């Protein structure tokens, strides 16, 4: 995880949170993500030892399969478990003690995959149901997770695929996300369709690196699954709805349809209506940069992408759908 949130302060943070004007005061800004809980020493020692064991297994698999044609695309599927646990401990991002168990399970799954990869096998690529995958980002070389829901009916024929952008979650560390994607189907599960859940660099509404991450996750998934390019749907709710709006207007040619839910589509209106901000006092460069992701600026592109927006009738974020 660990994105540099400083660059988002003037733009994303206030737009995603509902804290209002008081959150513009430096002394009032909450740390994001919040500090984690105190992990018992015994658990920390066990997890640290598990990390060392997994790191060794990853190195052995890498050496044994150095000439494997798919090594570069399969290795992140193993490394993602090491990174998730390592960063959770390193950056104090275990936010509840139940995540200690999730860390143990992540290390076990990582070790299982490493041992299989050492033998040149990758059984998770044939797995149905919930599948945790990962790829190496072209932006910074980091391993980034994403989740898949593979229907039982999938046999390798071209299939509809829905991309679901997740909502706000300040404690959604990479460990929490990997655990979630291994255990929860999620908000949507269309019949006979694959669902792809991008992590999108934590809680930034798939902006900046999070934007490219969703596209890279799709690119990686296409290497292993017969995704029908004519049946890819862009979806999301709340903060994920905001992401769906931007993807719909900026990449209208990639989707057969878009389905944003309760997500802001333009910054000034959202800040004023949802957070009671006085946007008239914003600097010229803030207002200029808002247009980077203001979906209304490129709404004409929706002629190429059928779009159905939805929201609760008393939700202030209904403004975007209206």
Which residues does each predicted region cover?
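A domain-start/cap signature at the N-terminus of enzymes
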Residues: 20-37, 91-159
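Hydrolases whose catalytic domains are alpha/beta-hydrolase-1, hotdog thioesterase
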Residues: 243-247, 259
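Amphipathic, heptad-repeat alpha-helical segments
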Residues: 20-78
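Gly/Ser-rich "nucleophile elbow"/oxyanion-hole loop immediately N-terminal to the catalytic nucleophile
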Residues: 153-157, 206-239, 249-255, 276, ...
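Short beta-strand immediately N-terminal to the catalytic nucleophile in serine-hydrolase-like folds
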Residues: 234-236, 259-261, 310
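Conserved strand-to-loop "acid loop" that flanks and positions the catalytic carboxylate
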Residues: 306-315
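Active-site machinery of serine-nucleophile hydrolases
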Residues: 156-225
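Mobile cap/lid helix-loop segments that gate and shape the active-site cleft of serine hydrolases
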Residues: 169-181, 253-300, 304-305, 319
């Amino acid at each position: 995880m660990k994105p540099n949130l400083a660059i988002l302060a003037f733009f994303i943070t206030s737009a995603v949170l509902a804290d209002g004007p008081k959150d513009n005061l430096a002394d009032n800004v909450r740390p994001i993500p919040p500090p984690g809980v105190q992990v018992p020493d015994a658990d920390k020692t066990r997890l640290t030892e598990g990390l060392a064991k997994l790191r060794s297994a990853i190195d052995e698999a890498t050496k044994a399969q150095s000439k494997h044609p798919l090594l570069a695309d399969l290795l992140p599927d193993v490394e993602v478990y090491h990174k998730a646990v390592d960063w959770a401990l390193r950056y104090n991002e275990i936010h509840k003690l139940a995540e200690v168990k999730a860390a143990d399970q992540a290390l076990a799954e990582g070790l299982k995959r490493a041992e299989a990869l050492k033998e040149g096998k990758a059984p998770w690529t044939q797995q149905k149901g919930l599948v945790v995958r990962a790829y190496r980002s072209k932006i910074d070389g980091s391993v980034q997770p994403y989740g898949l829901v593979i229907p039982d009916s999938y046999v390798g024929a071209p299939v509809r695929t829905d991309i679901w952008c997740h909502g706000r979650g300040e404690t959604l560390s990479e460990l929490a996300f990997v655990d979630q994607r291994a255990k929860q189907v999620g908000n949507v599960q269309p019949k006979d369709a694959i669902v792809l859940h991008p992590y999108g660099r934590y809680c930034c509404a798939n902006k900046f690196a999070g934007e490219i991450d969703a596209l890279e996750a799709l690119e990686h998934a296409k290497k292993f699954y017969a995704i029908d390019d004519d049946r890819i749907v862009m979806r999301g709710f709340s903060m994920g709805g905001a992401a769906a709006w931007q993807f719909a207007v900026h990449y209208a040619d990639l989707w057969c349809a878009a389905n944003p839910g309760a997500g802001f589509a333009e910054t000034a209106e959202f800040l004023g209506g949802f957070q009671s901000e006085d946007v008239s006092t914003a600097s010229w460069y803030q207002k200029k940069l808002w247009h980077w992701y203001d979906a209304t600026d490129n709404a004409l592109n929706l002629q190429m992408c059928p779009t159905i927006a939805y929201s609760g009738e008393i939700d202030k974020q209904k403004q975007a759908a209206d």
